[in-house]
């Protein structure tokens, strides 16, 4: 076989290997991607009970109810069109409040309500942890005094 043909075959094999590796990486990434359903998407999808999903949206103002045990809360997640009642038992993140963004990991009960096992509070790009806010305020005060 000529050297030209050997290089061509080697190039084809290398190209096939790169395509196969890319395909495998894409399949693996798709399985690991963490998408969430908005309330509208969840209602349209008619998701089966006890299937774990992520539900994302805004905590509806006026919907947050804390039970006397101190760890159980009930609230509604909305995307502006649909609302879904959510129950959660556990400690909520500091940023969790009415009107803020939330992603809840959990499942729908046979009754249609959503039981969250984990709650993630979303924040905007201007968020600063409380310690950083205190440091920034102290720096601002120091600069104003000078």
Curated annotation (Swiss-Prot):
Gene Ontology cellular component terms for the protein in this record: plasma membrane
Gene Ontology molecular function, alphabetical: heme binding; metal ion binding
Cited function: Heme chaperone required for the biogenesis of c-type cytochromes. Transiently binds heme delivered by CcmC and transfers the heme to apo-cytochromes in a process facilitated by CcmF and CcmH.
Topology, Periplasmic side: 29-146
Bilayer topology: Single-pass type II membrane protein
UniProt: heme binding residues: 123, 127
GO biological process: cytochrome complex assembly
Residue ranges annotated as Cytoplasmic topological domain: 1-7
Compartments reported by the entry: Cell inner membrane
Pfam families noted in UniProt: CcmE
InterPro entries, per the entry: CcmE, CcmE-like_sf, NA-bd_OB-fold
NCBIfam families: PRK13254.1-1 (NF009727), PRK13254.1-5 (NF009731)
Similarity remark: Belongs to the CcmE/CycJ family.
Gene3D superfamilies: Nucleic acid-binding proteins
Record-given protein name: Cytochrome c-type biogenesis protein CcmE
Ranges that cross the membrane: 8-28
Keywords, sorted A to Z: Cell inner membrane, Cell membrane, Cytochrome c-type biogenesis, Heme, Iron, Membrane, Metal-binding, Signal-anchor, Transmembrane, Transmembrane helix
Gene name of the encoded protein: ccmE
Native source organism of the sequence: Zymomonas mobilis subsp. mobilis (strain ATCC 31821 / ZM4 / CP4)
């Amino acid at each position: 076989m000529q050297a030209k043909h050997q290089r061509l075959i080697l190039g084809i094999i290398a190209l096939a290997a790169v395509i196969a590796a890319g395909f495998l990486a894409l399949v693996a990434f798709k399985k690991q991607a963490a998408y969430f359903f908005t309330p509208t998407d969840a209602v349209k999808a008619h998701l089966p009970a006890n299937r774990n999903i992520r539900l994302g949206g805004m905590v509806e103002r006026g919907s947050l109810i804390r039970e006397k045990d101190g760890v159980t809360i009930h609230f509604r997640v909305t995307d502006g069109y649909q609302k879904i009642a959510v129950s959660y038992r556990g400690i909520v993140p500091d940023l969790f409040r009415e009107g803020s963004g939330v992603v809840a990991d959990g499942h729908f009960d046979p009754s249609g309500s959503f039981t969250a096992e984990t709650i993630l509070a979303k924040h905007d790009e201007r968020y600063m942890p409380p310690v950083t806010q205190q440091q920034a305020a102290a720096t601002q005060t120091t600069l104003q005094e000078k």
